[in-house]
Amino acid sequence: MSQLLTSRQAEELHKSMIAYLNSANLLHSAATLREELDIGESFDSATSKKYEGLLEKKWTSVVRLQKKIMDLESRNAALQSEIDNATPTSLSNRNTDPTAWLPKSPARHNLQSHREAITCVAFHPVFSSLASGSEDCTIKIWDWELGELELTVKGHTRAVLDVDFGGPRGGTLLASCSSDLTIKLWDPSDQYKNIRTLPGHDHSVSAVRFIPSGAAGSPSSGNLLVSASRDKTLRIWDVSTGYCVKTVRGHADWVRDVAPSYDGRWLLSAGVDQTARIWDASSGEPKATLLGHENTIECCVFAPPASYPHLAAMAGLKKPPAASSSAEYIATGARDKSIRIWDARGTLIKTLIGHDNWIRALVFHPGGKYLLSVADDRTLRCWDLAQEGKCVKTISDAHGHFVSCMRWAPSVIKDAPLLNGENGVGTPIKNGNGATKKEDAKGSDIDCTSLMPQIPSI
């Protein structure tokens, strides 16, 4: 013992042992130990009280440290195994090419608080905040970096069907829409206070998106919002006044989804009538109608310019469109279990088959090479556009139930998180740049799959 402990440490250990024996009412043993250690009358009741409980604290600390060591050893072994199984090329790509990074299991966080199915998720454009909407009529705000609930926002009287962050520069707002026929605007800078309610739709409002600044006819940059409804219409709103500035008609049934182009010039909508439609955002006039799906189209998205080289090659073109063009290619996902890629004239380029149930959400990878999808088959799939849309990765354990939504955070590639959601009660956040939402029959989760590229790792 003298080789391991200093004289002071040895003295404290001896006194702790004696104090422990006294507290255990083993007085004879305590006296014997004092005699053997030559600890005299200086060890009085005050000294005994000082050292009482110290031995137990040291013991429990050792147990905690042993557990921590075991956990770290297990994590180290898993990381070593990953390194051993990786090729030099894959390691190089992981460390130098975030544009090729793809999500993987396990989830980083599992966020639980909703009491019914989660229907939608959205990232704050600046802060590490994540909003989730649910059939329990609430919106919950989470810190997706910490995996903690920050706030529950109440106001809707029926299921919240979609949420989106946006608004004028320097004045970010949260918009939500609901089966209660309303759209509500919330102020993140004031504890998500409800600052405006937009009535006008005649049925459930299924989707809502801020239109990026630059749209022709915008009364003020960043002030436009578009909504899609079961009343078969799209409506464009001025969030500064709350007025509906345009109603767009053309769909023959429920409009399930709407997406603006990156410059705000075009709108893409899709719905139960099995069509996707491209509209001029300033005039509301149709540009193209996409026909081919055999069931309800659940989701639609414009391809970013970074995807143009891959999609142009897939379409058989020698030269991709100019990056300044914002509505050249489109992807749609439907209840016919297929994903279809189109050009802006409505020509079908490719049909991607692989999901076993309804396609619920699509996002293009910020690097442009991949298209990611989630579906009611509980999977997240990654399609390589440079390989004719080949499915190069499937996360089969993304959720324990239907995966109902997915979003990629509006950020630079190295920071951009992805979020997808499901009918359940928890939210796993996966290592990477994004988030996913998971739900089961007992409640609602948000599976925030933070799909961050490995540079830097978090």
Swiss-Prot record:
Biological source species: Sclerotinia sclerotiorum (strain ATCC 18683 / 1980 / Ss-1) (White mold)
* Job description of the protein: Positively regulates the activity of the minus-end directed microtubule motor protein dynein. May enhance dynein-mediated microtubule sliding by targeting dynein to the microtubule plus end. Required for nuclear migration during vegetative growth as well as development. Required for retrograde early endosome (EE) transport from the hyphal tip. Required for localization of dynein to the mitotic spindle poles. Recruits additional proteins to the dynein complex at SPBs.
InterPro entries recorded for this chain? Dynein_regulator_LIS1, G-protein_beta_WD-40_rep, LIS1_N, LisH, PAC1-like_LisH-like_dom, WD40/YVTN_repeat-like_dom_sf, WD40_repeat_CS, WD40_repeat_dom_sf
Q: Which residues form a coiled coil?
A: 60-87
Q: Where are the WD repeats?
A: 113-152, 155-196, 200-247, 250-289, 292-352, 354-393, 398-440
Query: What HAMAP family does the record tag this protein with?
Result: lis1 (MF_03141)
Q: What domain comment accompanies this record?
A: Dimerization mediated by the LisH domain may be required to activate dynein.
Pfam families listed in its UniProt record? LisH_PAC1, WD40
Location of the region described as Disordered in the Swiss-Prot/TrEMBL record: 81-101, 424-446
SMART domains per record: WD40 (SM00320)
Could you tell me the keywords of this UniProt record? Cell cycle, Cell division, Coiled coil, Cytoplasm, Cytoskeleton, Microtubule, Mitosis, Repeat, Transport, WD repeat
Q: Which GO terms describe its molecular function?
A: dynein complex binding; microtubule plus-end binding
Broad class of where this protein is predominantly found: cytoplasm
What GO CC terms are in its UniProt record? cytoplasmic microtubule; kinetochore; microtubule associated complex; nuclear envelope; spindle pole
Question: Spans of biased composition, class Basic and acidic residues?
Answer: 436-445
Subunit description = Self-associates. Interacts with ndl1 and dynein.
Which family does this protein fall into?
Belongs to the WD repeat LIS1/nudF family.
Query: What's a GO biological-process term for it?
Result: nuclear migration
Per UniProt, subcellular location reads as: Cytoplasm, Cytoskeleton; Cytoplasm, Cytoskeleton, Spindle pole
For bias type Polar residues, the affected ranges are 81-98
| Family matches, as Gene3D superfamilies | 1.20.960.30, YVTN repeat-like/Quinoprotein amine dehydrogenase
What is the protein name given in its UniProt record?
Nuclear distribution protein PAC1
Q: Per the database record, which ranges form the LisH domain?
A: 9-41
